[in-house]
Amino acid sequence: MRYGQFCPIAKAAEIVAERWTPLVVAEMLAGSVHFSDIRRGVPLMSQTLLSKRLKELERVGVVERRGANPRRPEWHLTQAGHALAPVIQHLGEWGLCHAQDPIQDDDLDVTILTWNIR
């Protein structure tokens, strides 16, 4: 999403506020580096969209693709990606305090819960 204005918040939002991107970054901050592991942390995200988001994050310098095996690359956060850690942490804390909608049955996923407590 482009805001079309020179504002640091708008520029940051163009990168990290795309749908699913904060969850992808959070999953990578938790240690996932392989596509399949990142995907496991965001199971409702399509593989196509995850691939697109990783390539976008690579293009803007938030992640980098590494690995000798091109069929199983590793995705690593760059210094810029790691700098998002407090942002993601505070976003989660804000959600705990202020996103008070009642939990719906479809919000609960045992697979995601178990993956996140690893």
Question: What role is predicted for each listed range?
Answer:
Residues 7-48, 71:
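N-terminal helix-turn-helix DNA-binding core of bacterial DNA-binding proteins
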Residues 17, 69-90:
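Basic, amphipathic "hinge/linker" alpha-helix immediately C-terminal to the N-terminal HTH DNA-binding motif
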Residues 53:
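Residues within the DNA-recognition helix of helix-turn-helix
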Residues 61:
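Glycine-centered, phosphate/nucleic-acid-interacting loop/turn motifs that mediate DNA/RNA or nucleotide
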Residues 65:
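Short beta-strand "wing" residues that participate in macromolecule-binding interfaces
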Residues 86-118:
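Amphipathic alpha-helical dimerization/coiled-coil segments
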